[in-house]
Amino acid sequence: MSVTSTASSSRELRAGGGLSGTVRVPGDKSISHRALLFGAIAEGITTIEGLLPAEDPMSTAACLRAMGATISPIHAGQIVRVEGVGLDGLQEPQDVLDCGNSGTTIRLMLGLLAASKGRHFVLSGDSSLRRRPMNRVGQPLTMMGAKIKGRSNGDFAPLAVSGQKLRGGVIGTPVASAQVKSALLLAALTADGATTVIEPAHSRDHSERMLRAFGADLEVGGEMGRHIRVSPGQKLYGQNIVVPGDISSAAFWLVAGVLVPGAELVVENVGLNPTRTGILEVLQQMEARIEVLNRHEVAGEPVGDLRVRQGPLKPFSINGDIIPRLVDEVPILAVAACFCDGESKITDASELRVKETDRLAVMTRQLTAMGADIDEHADGLTIRGGRTLRGTELDSETDHRVAMSLAVAALLAEGNSRLTGSEAAAVSYPNFWDDLERLHR
């Protein structure tokens, strides 16, 4: 047995051993959020197969239910049924909308609710979410006529939204963020006139793909698809959605598979959307032994199985436009860099400082405690690999991706580790610890 839980928040991680078998990661978190949201504002019934039954999508579902949408209970392995209320059918809730720990929930809701003319909403969340910046969404929405108030001039929740009839136009996003872009696309669905959203770099495009499938009049153009135009007036209609496995969750097994001596894993049914496969490109740059098998398409999203085998890795350097395509995978790439002979560099990644935690600082703290050689910069990390990591006391600092990244690091350390805050993994991967125990030989 590789993992022992001794308390609700503390877990022993045993080093050594092999890693082999087949694993199917949970449904993609980004697609799960959007399927719930778009289904709720469509007309008719939407069914969702493979929806991620984790805390963040549960927060989205709870908010939508509070505004009148009917959503069946969410359980692993069960199809979720959403009865839509139409584009302008969401009602004022009786209480504050609790977005939990989910930045996707609160930011996409801002776009949707800012356009709900004549209704008033208050959005909040847990202590971590209340520290995350919201003006990146609020300011471009204000350019469309939105009225949003909150702490620090609207930058921090709780946020009060007074729904308005918004106006279209050409709106540039301040950062390459799928959350910001998606909020603006939702606002544009009922705006007065067409809206063109322009990103500084291409971010994940699940919203564009899915909104078109639901019937939105949406066109993508410009360099690398950075210009998205929405013409209002089209109703959305319920769809049957199949959610592929989340490549951000698969990333932990991919890195573990190339690092653990003798490892061989197959990760099944992984979404391979080109705006999300930066992790595969970096692992290929590192000469990792990864094959894509059984390529096919599900509900407009490319999908495949990934076979990974252990082998030596070369150091890597990442920056620029690839960062939005692997922003959630930087913590596990930092772990991989610790086991490459040579220096790896991550730059242009300041966005990680405003995730669930400051992930650059947290990963530096935790990996340094294990003996890693890391320099932290304003927008990234320099990691000199090849040092032996030591088992020690670790802390996820409440961040799900940190928790799972440290679990992989602990497998390869000398001596066991103890992880505080291991339950954070449930935000995106409820069965992570069970899968680790099953695969670790």
From Swiss-Prot:
Pfam families listed in its UniProt record: EPSP_synthase (PF00275)
Any one Gene Ontology BP term: amino acid biosynthetic process
Record pathway: Metabolic intermediate biosynthesis; chorismate biosynthesis; chorismate from D-erythrose 4-phosphate and phosphoenolpyruvate: step 6/7
Biased composition (Polar residues): 1-10
Coiled-coil ranges per UniProt: none
Region (Disordered): 1-21
NCBIfam families: aroA (TIGR01356)
Protein name listed in UniProt: 3-phosphoshikimate 1-carboxyvinyltransferase
Species the sequence originates in: Prochlorococcus marinus (strain MIT 9303)
Protein encoded by which gene: aroA
